[in-house]
């Protein structure tokens, strides 16, 4: 679940929280300004986008371990702000950054979609979501086919070729990363990855022979890599027998610290 997608859900509730409660934070850098927060936000967003591994976003355990100290340092920078006297809109922005960092922390500690949910690796999207980004966890290099106009011009064909290039290495990485035991997520995820293969086949028909050989090769290689992942997922399905839920306590933490909604699981369902 990309933390950038949290913004639309929490702007209103953050404003309510700020108006209704104090915002005291560690006072060491009392001179920290809103400009400093903007600089931190830029650093945070740079960090939140993972490095590449063989041309695809890196979701390996080693990557998260290697960068954890950097993440904790960003958290400390945010916690050090003294925002009590800031205008309310600027305080809200502080909470937005806090929520995004909490979302990242929750994903790497609890949700771990890159390890538990095969659908996380779905890359090709043929339709626009009815939410600002996409529902459910998605990775950082999606191919939004619905944004392209067909027939493709040369510039668009080149851009699509580059976007499709991440699919083979990402499908390979998925087989190493998917160590989770969430059965329902596993079974549903197979369907999503299989659908990607069908969407790529339709794309190949749509572009025909009028595009560059490099684009056709990128489509073919993406289909092969996607099909190989489907076969692997199906072979592993029988051994994935665990629950897919994260538990009430974790849900409550996510609700309160990421979406900034002051409710518990029990309050939501009653």
How should these model regions be labeled?
Residues 23-270:
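N-terminal maturation segment of proteins
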Residues 1-5:
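N-terminal secretory signal peptides that target proteins for export/translocation
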Residues 8-21:
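Bacterial N-terminal signal peptides
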């Amino acid at each position: 679940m990309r933390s950038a997608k949290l913004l639309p859900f929490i702007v209103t509730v953050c404003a309510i929280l700020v108006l209704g409660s104090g915002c005291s934070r560690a006072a060491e850098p009392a001179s920290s300004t809103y400009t400093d927060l903007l600089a931190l936000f830029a650093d945070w967003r740079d960090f939140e986008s993972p490095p590449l591994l063989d041309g695809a976003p890196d979701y390996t355990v080693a990557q998260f371990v290697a960068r954890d100290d950097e993440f904790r340092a960003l958290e400390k920078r945010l916690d050090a702000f003294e925002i009590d006297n800031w205008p309310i809109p600027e305080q809200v922005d502080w909470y937005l950054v806090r929520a995004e960092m909490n979302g990242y922390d929750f994903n790497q500690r609890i949700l771990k979609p890159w390890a538990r949910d095969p659908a996380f690796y779905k890359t090709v999207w043929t339709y626009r979501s009815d939410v600002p980004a996409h529902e459910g966890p998605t990775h950082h290099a999606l191919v939004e086919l619905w944004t392209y106009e067909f027939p493709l011009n040369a510039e668009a064909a080149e851009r699509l070729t580059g976007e499709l290039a991440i699919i083979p290495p990402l499908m390979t990485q998925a087989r190493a990363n998917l160590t989770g035991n969430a059965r329902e997520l596993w079974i549903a995820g197979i369907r999503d990855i299989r659908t990607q293969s069908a969407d790529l086949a339709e794309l190949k028909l749509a572009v025909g022979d009028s595009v560059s050989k490099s684009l056709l090769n990128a489509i073919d290689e993406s289909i092969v890599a996607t099909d190989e992942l489907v076969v692997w997922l199906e072979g592993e399905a029988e051994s994935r027998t665990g629950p897919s839920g994260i538990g009430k306590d974790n849900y409550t933490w996510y609700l309160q610290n990421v979406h900034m909604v002051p409710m518990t699981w029990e309050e939501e369902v009653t």
